[in-house]
């Protein structure tokens, strides 16, 4: 088992039914899927300001799952609390979040990097005082709207739900993201990067 493998998976999103299944919550979606598959019960933990659970996964060892419930812009507070409590290093985490600059059907693993325009990542980098931690970006595509107000178009896009026509591809993306995550946990982030960063999924062609 690789020495650089993550042990804490952090999915970013906004809490509450209002934001469930929105593009901005694709990180939450993957954590929920992993929790279900691994039999992990996620419970609200006040000291962590998030939904938290842990388990021993066969072949992967002890894994912790976290969904910050601070709202996206304060995600770093929740993650910092977990790192301090368990004395984990930034290199032991994998942050999973949405990325508009990648099309739906692409994912990108990196060992470090900037936050770009993602406010959840800005909060995490600020609270960790470091950009050196693994992350998994899941593409949600750019807004299709040609609105003159780019900010409004962006907000509407990330807080909007995936279209019916995107649901099949979304499921494939989550399948692939789960594979990539489990590879990172088992063999290290670099191995997962080499195996999955070049993969590209496309929506199935409509039946004639």
UniProtKB/Swiss-Prot annotation:
Reaction(s) this enzyme catalyzes, per UniProt: an N-acyl-L-alpha-aminoacyl-tRNA + H2O = an N-acyl-L-amino acid + a tRNA + H(+)
Known partners and oligomeric status: Monomer.
Gene name of the record: pth
InterPro entries reported in the protein's UniProt record: Pept_tRNA_hydro, Pept_tRNA_hydro_CS, Pept_tRNA_hydro_sf
Protein's name in the database: Peptidyl-tRNA hydrolase
Enzyme active site: 24 (proton acceptor)
Family from the record: Belongs to the PTH family.
Species annotation: Synechococcus elongatus (strain ATCC 33912 / PCC 7942 / FACHB-805)
GO biological process terms, semicolon-separated: protein quality control for misfolded or incompletely synthesized proteins; rescue of stalled ribosome
Role: Hydrolyzes ribosome-free peptidyl-tRNAs (with 1 or more amino acids incorporated), which drop off the ribosome during protein synthesis, or as a result of ribosome stalling.
């Amino acid at each position: 088992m690789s020495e650089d493998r993550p042990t804490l998976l952090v999915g970013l999103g906004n809490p509450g039914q209002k934001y469930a299944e929105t593009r901005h919550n694709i990180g939450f979606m993957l954590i929920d899927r992993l929790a279900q598959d691994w039999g992990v019960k996620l419970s609200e933990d006040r000291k962590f300001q998030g939904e938290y659970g842990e388990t021993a996964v066969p072949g992967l060892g002890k894994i912790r799952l976290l969904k910050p419930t601070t709202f996206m812009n304060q995600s770093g507070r929740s993650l910092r609390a977990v790192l301090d409590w368990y004395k984990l290093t930034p290199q032991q985490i994998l942050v999973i979040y949405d990325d508009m600059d990648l099309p739906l059907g692409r994912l990108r693993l990196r060992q470090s990097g900037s936050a770009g325009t993602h406010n959840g990542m800005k909060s995490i980098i600020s609270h960790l005082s470091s950009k050196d931690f693994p992350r998994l970006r899941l593409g949600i595509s750019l807004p299709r709207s040609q609105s003159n107000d780019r900010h409004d178009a962006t907000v509407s896009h990330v807080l909007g739900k995936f279209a019916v026509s995107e649901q099949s591809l979304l499921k494939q993306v989550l399948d692939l993201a789960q594979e990539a995550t489990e590879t990172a946990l088992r063999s290290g982030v670099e191995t997962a990067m080499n195996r999955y960063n070049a993969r590209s999924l496309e929506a199935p062609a409509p039946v004639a």
